[in-house]
Curated annotation (Swiss-Prot):
UniProt gene name: chmp3
The protein's name: Charged multivesicular body protein 3
Taxonomic lineage from the root: Eukaryota, Amoebozoa, Evosea, Eumycetozoa, Dictyostelia
Alphabetic keyword roster: Coiled coil, Endosome, Membrane, Protein transport, Transport
Biological source species: Dictyostelium discoideum
Entry's family note: Belongs to the SNF7 family.
Coiled coil segments of this chain: 183-207
Amino acid sequence: MFSFLKKPTPEELVKKWKRELRREDRGLDTQLRAIDMQEKKTVRMIKERVKAGDQKSAKTLAKEIVNSRKAKERIYTAKAQMNSVSMQLQSNLAMTKVQGNLAKSTEIMKMMNDLIKLPELNKVMMAMGSEMTKAGIMEEMISDVFDMQGEDLEEEAEMEVNKIMDEILVSGPQVSSAPLETHQQEEVVQEKQEDSELLDRLKALKS
């Protein structure tokens, strides 16, 4: 009776948090796959725009790739931090046998404050951080959210755009070391020729 009022044990709390971290990690994997799929579509669209002589639209699309790659970097960093939080929690739990309760951890607090800034994780990390604060692991969290849309493309970013344009148009398909069928060889040659023509068009547009 009244078992629902019972305070969760450190083991129960850590198990719950690690389960939530794994769930969020899977969600980030789904986002990464979606970004990769969209990036492939954008690359095809850039080639089409360059072929049509529309460099302005091509560069606008290239900016989307710059932003998507930055988003992927943030997601990979978040995944690594969540894994570190999970390991720190497990280590902290092992210490409860000596201390009797979950100890305060500046490492966990720092990583949680970083994770909470990502819009994708803000809500879940806020709730988890509140529970960790009550459990004595950390102090109050900073609730600032990182605005991914507020990044301006300055000169450095413009260089990134040009780099991506060159990367897309210069790099041909990767050829396997295994022998290719005749029709496959023809397709590879044709794609390289098309990319070379697109690069010439781009240079002409820039001049």
